[in-house]
């Protein structure tokens, strides 16, 4: 699957700082120690039944900064992101709107790519859809069946499930108690009340063919995969048995990341599947999490269509720590616009305060579990000092600009991004 155009990245001088990140599984901040061959990161992507909202954008910006800090440290980064282009929400939206689910998925995936390019997100080396990966996914289900880590429900449906007893460490990523697991499982795509399962928490691996639903061939019979096995299969195929970071929003801690890790570990016996499980906080609006079910979404494409500079969107999302749930407000938006204007003014001067000191402070803050608010403050202080006209480092504006663009991903020369000619229907969310 096609990704998007990469932003320009400059190699910075000076001393990079190794990255430390909070690991959900170990519940503490630890150094990331990528393999000498390169860092490996898998981030769960969109289910393309609607446009990119600010919650998606915040997550993608988070892992983009990780990518940038690793690159600053000289690591080659193998970054893989999936597209869940076969799933119930996609089918339901397509049926509601009287549209082919394939066409809907392709259109919204194209819009997502445009949004990511506008936000200066470094594209993944492999941008992979579930549909194109179906043979790989089916093969992993078959592998789990052969290993005794799956069972078929005895009701003639052909549905195959993964038992929570298949791995000894189930629950070690989320640390949730059983009641919490059951609640989230039911709320986030699971089927705890499904009859015939050995345990209410057992997760679907393969859904047997149903009339009116898409299906694919496998040794287990025609059908389609469950959600969690898709990510496990794609990650294993493109990154190997163990990865450095498995990431997404904090609503994926359970069941999605718990089960995708368990699927991978049951198949490969490589434990843990990821050295770091990293989760971004939710973006809220009017005191509630931003979500499609609540209808309170702010779309990146709508902001762009209204003339909002993508750099302002990115700065606003960087203003809070990535692990915190935080609101999107008019005040946040306005503050980001003001900040960007000050930065651009300061970086347009012929000289300024010490750029070397500021660049190092930005590196130090980002390497400390992505302290983006601290990094922004470092640039704020440099801009304020430079705008007084009392400092005369002629190299500073260019150095700080390169630091901001390379590490924070904030574009300081405004760019014009293309809009799709078909965007009118996509951007009209009033229906």
Swiss-Prot record:
Swiss-Prot/TrEMBL cofactor(s): Zn(2+)
Binding site for Zn(2+): 44, 231, 256
Binding, L-cysteinyl-5'-AMP: 44-47, 59, 82-84, 227, 249-251, 283
SUPFAM superfamilies (UniProt xref): Nucleotidylyl transferase
Residue interval(s) of motif 'ERGGDP' region: 187-192
EC number(s) on file: 6.3.1.13
Motif ('KMSKS' region): 289-293
Superkingdom of origin: Bacteria
Sequence motif 'HIGH' region, residues: 46-56
Keyword list, A-Z: ATP-binding, Ligase, Metal-binding, Nucleotide-binding, Zinc
A GO molecular-function annotation: cysteine-glucosaminylinositol ligase activity
One Pfam assignment: tRNA-synt_1e
Record InterPro entries: Cys-tRNA/MSH_ligase, Mycothiol_ligase_MshC, Rossmann-like_a/b/a_fold, tRNA-synt_1_cat_dom
Catalytic activities: 1D-myo-inositol 2-amino-2-deoxy-alpha-D-glucopyranoside + L-cysteine + ATP = 1D-myo-inositol 2-(L-cysteinylamino)-2-deoxy-alpha-D-glucopyranoside + AMP + diphosphate + H(+)
One GO BP: cysteinyl-tRNA aminoacylation
Cofactor annotation remark: Binds 1 zinc ion per subunit.
Subunit structure: Monomer.
Family that this chain belongs to: Belongs to the class-I aminoacyl-tRNA synthetase family. MshC subfamily.
Protein name, as recorded: L-cysteine:1D-myo-inositol 2-amino-2-deoxy-alpha-D-glucopyranoside ligase
């Amino acid at each position: 699957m096609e990704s998007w155009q990469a932003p320009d990245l400059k190699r910075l001088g000076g001393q990079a700082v190794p990255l430390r990140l909070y690991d959900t599984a170990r519940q503490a901040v630890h150094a990331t120690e990528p393999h000498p061959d390169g860092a490996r990161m898998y981030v769960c992507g969109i289910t393309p039944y609607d446009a990119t909202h600010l919650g998606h954008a915040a997550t993608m910006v988070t892992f983009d900064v990780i990518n940038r800090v690793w690159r600053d440290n000289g690591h080659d980064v193998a970054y893989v992101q999936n597209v869940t282009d076969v799933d119930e929400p996609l089918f339901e939206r397509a049926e509601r709107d009287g549209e082919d689910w394939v066409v809907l998925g392709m259109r919204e995936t194209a819009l997502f790519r445009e949004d990511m390019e506008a936000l200066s997100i470094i594209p993944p080396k492999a941008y992979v859809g579930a549909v194109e990966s179906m043979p790989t996914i089916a093969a992993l289900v078959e592998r789990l069946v052969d290993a005794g880590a799956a069972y078929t429900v005895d009701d003639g449906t052909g549905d195959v499930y993964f038992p929570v007893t298949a791995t000894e460490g189930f629950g070690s990523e989320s640390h949730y108690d059983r009641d919490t697991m059951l609640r989230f499982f039911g709320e986030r795509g699971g089927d705890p009340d499904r009859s015939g399962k050995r345990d209410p928490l057992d997760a679907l691996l393969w859904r047997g063919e149903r009339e009116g639903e898409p299906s694919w061939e496998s040794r287990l019979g025609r059908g389609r995969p469950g959600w969690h096995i898709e990510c496990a299969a794609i990650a294993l195929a493109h990154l190997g048995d163990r990865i450095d970071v498995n990431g997404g929003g904090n609503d994926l801690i359970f069941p999605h990341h718990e089960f995708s890790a368990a699927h991978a570990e049951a198949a490969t016996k490589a434990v843990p599947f990821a050295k770091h499980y990293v989760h971004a906080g939710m973006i809220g609006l009017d005191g509630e999490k931003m979500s499609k079910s609540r209808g309170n979404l702010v779309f990146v494409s709508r902001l762009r269509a209204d003339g909002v500079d993508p750099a302002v969107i990115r700065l606003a999302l960087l203003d809070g720590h990535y692990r915190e749930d935080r609101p999107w407000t008019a005040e946040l938006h306005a503050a980001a616009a003001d900040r960007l204007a000050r930065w651009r003014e300061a970086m347009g001067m012929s000289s300024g305060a010490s750029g070397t000191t500021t660049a190092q402070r930005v590196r130090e803050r980002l390497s400390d579990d992505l302290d983006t608010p601290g990094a922004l403050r470092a640039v704020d202080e440099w801009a304020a000092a430079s705008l007084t006209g009392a400092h005369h480092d002629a190299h500073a504006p260019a150095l700080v600009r390169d630091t901001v663009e390379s590490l924070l991903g904030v574009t300081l020369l405004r760019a014009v991004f293309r809009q799709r000619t078909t965007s009118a229907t996509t951007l009209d969310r009033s229906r």
